[in-house]
Amino acid sequence: MSLSMRDPVIPGTSMAYHPFLPHRAPDFAMSAVLGHQPPFFPALTLPPNGAAALSLPGALAKPIMDQLVGAAETGIPFSSLGPQAHLRPLKTMEPEEDVEDDPKVHLEAKELWDQFHKRGTEMVITKSGRRMFPPFKVRCSGLDKKAKYILLMDIIAADDCRYKFHNSRWMVAGKADPEMPKRMYIHPDSPATGEQWMSKVVTFHKLKLTNNISDKHGFTLAFPSDHATWQGNYSFGTQTILNSMHKYQPRFHIVRANDILKLPYSTFRTYLFPETEFIAVTAYQNDKITQLKIDNNPFAKGFRDTGNGRREKRKQLTLQSMRVFDERHKKETGTSDESSSEQAAFNCFAQASSPAVSTVGTSNLKDLCPSEAESDAEAESKEEHGPEACDTAKISTTTAEEPGRDKGSPATRAQLFPAEPSRARDTARLDKASPDSRHSPATISSSTRVPGADEHRSPGREGPVSAKVDEARALPAKDAFAPLSVQTDATAHLTQGPLPGLGFAPGLAGQQFFNGHPLFLHPGQFAMGGAFSSMAAGMGPLLATVSGASTGVSGLDSTAMASAAAAQGLSGASAATLPFHLQQHVLASQGLAMSPFGSLFPYPYTYMAAAAAASSAAASSSVHRHPFLNLNSMRPRLRYSPYSIPVPVPDSSSLLATALPSMASAAGPLDGKSAVLAASPASVAVDSGSELNSRSSTLSSGSVSLSPKLCSEKEAATSELQSIQRLVSGLEAKPDRSCSGSP
């Protein structure tokens, strides 16, 4: 029974083993079938006798019926064809032979390519890979909107020559080197429909050029021997390997295919643009090409003089400051003595927790500039000190509120005196003060400019006492380059509360040490008149004792107003009897600056020592315990910033207590009053101007808030100071602040 039932069954007609033969073979091209297969070719792994049947380039266009019939004729069992023989009909794929397109390609930025081509385009190649500029960008049209395309780019040798750049032109230097491994770059958006490709500019900006022959990026496909474009293995990746000093031609390819693995069996449409030809170099040979790249490439930071990073900005700031510094030096040595309109925008700010935050400006610019070797980590550490000081106090900064005011130039000097031999000798001695000026604290730096002639301020803003601000900047031209720098081992930090006081006579305000870096001191502690002995104690053996009978601040004034030979012999009373504006001009001519608010030493070394000796009885022991700050901890303050950072303003009563007795006994009424003004907790703002040419060192980017009440006895001299008042820029009067610091 069972045998009779099985006899009618034809062998091979069972559903499990019967091969599926479609009714209309042209509906199922091999390309359509492969498009829905995994990204490999398991169906093409045929035995040797049947390999030719399905491995031909045209196999993808053959109907599957023909392939199956051919396989049967060669004796291949259908089971060896694998799952290819059992595919169900696929209705979603359109036969490729029905797609008609006429692609057209247009090169983008053709004018820029032409400019480079006229001069001989060069492309830099590096071991890690360098992108092309101009980037290779094209716009496609004429593609079938529904069909999928793969867009590729490769770079081939334009000829078989090696080149060299000689006499400003490229010339043949011999036969080409052996060809590098072939490499093709596939656009990362591939495959995509024609509609997608035509809707945008196709850019190959991520392609990199390298000379690293061991580059392992990418993958390899084997192209059949009868492929129209290539034969053999061809690698695909993001980097193309080139030979230096060889000429190359980029090519653009369009392939209608929906799978990258079908590239070896697809038709390539290739497009050449002669203007994209270039020579591969390891460094640019033609300066014109370099300039073209700088002018047109927004990312050519390596060539451009100005960069966006901190180091680039700092470097350019340094170079500009040095140029201005040199120009000023030339003017000072010549007939003109003005440096009015050219000031470096180098604000090394140094605000501290003090009653009078004061004096930041352009000192010796070469030493103030942070070195190029400083790391960015150090630059970041410089910024960390800012927020600590920001929260504790409010600084009145009318300098930022009055941008119209010219802060640019110092007052006109009455005359120039030649440098005395003793001054030159002192300068030589001071040059030895800082063997390591690079690490000396260079933050509080007053103006070292030579006075110009066009400085002005709005009249009536300040009392006549503020005219001494001029004296703070009246430094001789020949002395503007030799600052004294002092190096100590004290470790007091800027934001660790009130620091030990270091008082200065008012006549010693507004200046700096003259040898490299200015001294980093507590700014508010410079305002104590007559407390100069603390500097003598703090500097130790650095200051030599100078013989003389000068007493107190007025004695210091007299030393400045006399000639160098007889300066030490004048009494304080004789100096105090001179009118204020005469004192100013005489002091300016001698190179000693006077100011109602305190800062650093004036230039003449003998004056400093004399003042230190004269005021030795005025300072308490706590004033000079730690007069200097730690060099390394305050180094981050050397950084330029266009913003002013608020700092704490502590109570100044203790500082006043040490300074006022000596002021009352030793100083004249004028100096005593100005010392009280400086001791008041008037905030002197650091210049907040961010212009590179801001002339911020006139008042060392800070001015004192003066009170008309404190200047009442000077109202008689107002008419004599009208011309001087127009030469001084400062903050508006703040009576409440000035009165709070007065006893």
Curated annotation (Swiss-Prot):
Where in or outside the cell is it found? Answer: Nucleus
Q: Provide ranges: composition bias, Polar residues.
A: 440-449
Q: Which SMART domains match?
A: TBOX
What is a single cellular component term in the Gene Ontology annotation?
Answer: cilium
Q: Which PROSITE patterns match?
A: TBOX_1 (PS01283), TBOX_2 (PS01264), TBOX_3 (PS50252)
Check the record and name the InterPro entries matching this protein: p53-like_TF_DNA-bd_sf (IPR008967), T-box_DNA-bd (IPR046360), T-box_sf (IPR036960), TBX2/3_TAD (IPR022582), TBX2_3_RD (IPR048387), TF_T-box (IPR001699), TF_T-box_CS (IPR018186)
DNA-binding region coordinates: 107-220, 241-305
| Pfam name, any one | T-box
Compositional bias (Basic and acidic residues) spans? 379-388, 422-439
The alphabetical list of record keywords is:
Developmental protein, DNA-binding, Nucleus, Phosphoprotein, Repressor, Transcription, Transcription regulation
Chief localization class? nucleus
A GO biological process held by the record: atrioventricular canal morphogenesis
Annotated stretches, region: Disordered: 371-467
State the Gene Ontology terms under molecular function: DNA-binding transcription activator activity, RNA polymerase II-specific; DNA-binding transcription factor activity; DNA-binding transcription factor activity, RNA polymerase II-specific; DNA-binding transcription repressor activity, RNA polymerase II-specific; RNA polymerase II cis-regulatory region sequence-specific DNA binding; RNA polymerase II-specific DNA-binding transcription factor binding; sequence-specific DNA binding; sequence-specific double-stranded DNA binding
Phosphoserine found at = 371, 434, 440, 458, 707, 738, 740, 742
Q: How does it assemble?
A: Interacts with PML.
| UniProt function note | Transcriptional repressor involved in developmental processes. Binds to the palindromic T site 5'-TTCACACCTAGGTGTGAA-3' DNA sequence, or a half-site, which are present in the regulatory region of several genes. Probably plays a role in limb pattern formation. Required for mammary placode induction, involved in maintenance of the mammary buds during development and branching morphogenesis in embryonic and adult glands; partially redundant with TBX2.
Q: Which protein is depicted?
A: T-box transcription factor TBX3
